[in-house]
Structures are given as structure tokens and as C-alpha cells.
């Protein structure tokens, strides 16, 4: 296999175990089996958005090439597949992973990637701190305008959680760092012994827990962004996705105008545009540069609120994912024709596969 270093200067990495690695905060982190298999089976994903001639790190180059062809129905591959044994011999100008964490940084150093291409330990620590759910909680007040809902409180004791329960009998507790669908507990009225054990463990391991009122969710969706080196935030597009028990299932592939039409059946497009502009002007992400996504949801109005009971409200910042998301993947596959609409799913039988079907 011939590699022309002068033409290929960016290395892309799909490390879906990133969220769990952030929570562990270990340099010698070992991902759970499901995370390792997801990375092995879908390591080709960066080829969907990489530039021609870029490298994509995979475990098996032949398997990645085959999986890419199957997923894209024969779309021409423009990248070079590489394995970890080749990294020390590559001439690179930049590295672009799914998300930065301490474990990935140390892996790449062990594989021979130049430290100057990687964020410093201090920068990785900053990314981890910004990935704390408090970042979303701090952004929320600047997004709370008419037609919106949402609050979150960081609790550092059982008593603080019980105080929130006295205000909101139905509560959602969230680990400060966790992957989709994990680290969530739904509390109805009081803390059980099971919940107390989970909570005390979390208070010890992560220093606290996020407490949020339970909302009657109608629809999940998100907005995808990229932040540049100078801190400028650019909007990339809407992400209309589906979850089951908090875990990602699939994304709609459609033009931005088609997605706006779909979401306008629930809430005002003008409201969405205002929220988008407030995110761009209000969110501060330090030295982080790269893709990120903000999960949102449409909820039925809580009868305790002083608004019409039939009203649908926007929760504008459920979570901030300071990494690439499946929404970004969907944007890289979205059609240019308003009449073409598909759905992208991650299916699992004996392995993970990216499937694209007509909607």
C-alpha cells in the first residue's frame, strides 16, 4: 500500500467510547466490550466527511473498506485506511478524533504520534470540565425565553437532591459525565434504597449529580455546530434523531428546509432561529475547537406552569456533547434534494452496521 505523505496530512479517528473514557478520567482506560466492538465495526465512519487523501485509523483496513462500500452502496472511497502500527511512520499535520479524552491522547502518544499534534494534558482536562453537565445548566438561563422550559441544578449531597424532590416530585438525576442512556435515574416521589446507593456512589466518584425536573417529552432533536480556533461558532444543521431509553437509534437524512418543516409541526421556526443565535453568541468553550452538538427536546407543558396546558415547549439545552455526534454523521450523508428523505440507523445483530433506508 502506497502512502503519499505530502498529500495526506489529517488523521481521523472514530472513538465512540469517548464519553465513558471522560467519566473514568483514566489514561489507561479500557472500554467496555460494546464500545470496543462499535469502534471496530464502524471505524470507517470518518471517511464520510474526511477530505480526499486524509487518513482514517481503523483496526482492519480490508474490513473497513468493505463496510464503507456496503454502507454507502459503492460510493467512491477518498481516504487511506491506516492501522495503529503505521501511525509512527505517517507525516501528519493534524488529528481529528470523535472526541478528545486523556485515554486517547495517551494511546496516540504510545503509537508514535507527535505530541505537538495533540492537545496538552491541560487542554484535555479543560475539555473534560466543559463536558460536565454543568456547562449545559449554565447556558440554559441565556436560552430561556418565551416558549421554552428547562432547569438543572448541581447537587453535591443527598440532602440537596431531597430539596429538589420537594420542589419537583418527579425528578431526573444525571451523572455529570456519562454516555447516552447511561448514568440516568428517574425518581418519582422519593429516593429508594437502590437510588440512594447509586447516588452516594456518584457523589463519591464524580462529586455530585445533576437534578432536573421530569418533562413529558414529545420529540428529541438537536443542533450541530463547529467552533473554530478563534472561538467562532458556526451552525452546521439540525439533527432529527430517535432514542429508546435514552440510547441513540437513528437519524433522519433530509435537507435543512425539509427538517425545519418537520420540526415546525411542533414549535416555531422563529423560536429555533433565536435559540440558535443565542447559542452562537453566548456559549464559551475555552480553547476547544471542533464539532459539538446540543441535544434539545419538545415537551408537553407542565400543568404546574402558568401557561396553556395544551402548549408544546422547547427545552433548548438538554445536553452539550463536546465532540462529533451522530447528527454530524447524518449531515455528511444528507441529500441535496428536498424530495429525498431517508433514515440512517445503527443496527446490531452479531456486529454493528450503518444502514440507510428510504423514509
List where the protein language model places each region.
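Conserved N-proximal alpha/beta basic substrate-recognition cap immediately N-terminal to
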Residues: 3, 36-45, 57-160
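A long amphipathic alpha-helix within ATP-dependent nucleotide-binding catalytic cores
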Residues: 206-208, 235, 246-313, 352-359
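N-terminal "leader" segments that precede or initiate the main folded domain
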Residues: 4-66
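Short, basic, low-complexity termini and linkers enriched in Ser/Thr/Gly/Pro
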Residues: 1-6, 87-92, 302-312
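ATP-dependent carboxylate/phosphate-activation module, predominantly the ATP-grasp catalytic core
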Residues: 225-278, 321-347
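ATP-grasp fold ATP-binding core
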Residues: 155, 165-186, 207-217, 294, ...
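Glycine-rich phosphate-binding loop of ATP-grasp-fold ATP-dependent ligases
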Residues: 151-152, 171-195, 222, 245-262
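Phosphate-binding site of ATP-dependent enzymes
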Residues: 169, 194-247, 297-301, 310-317, ...
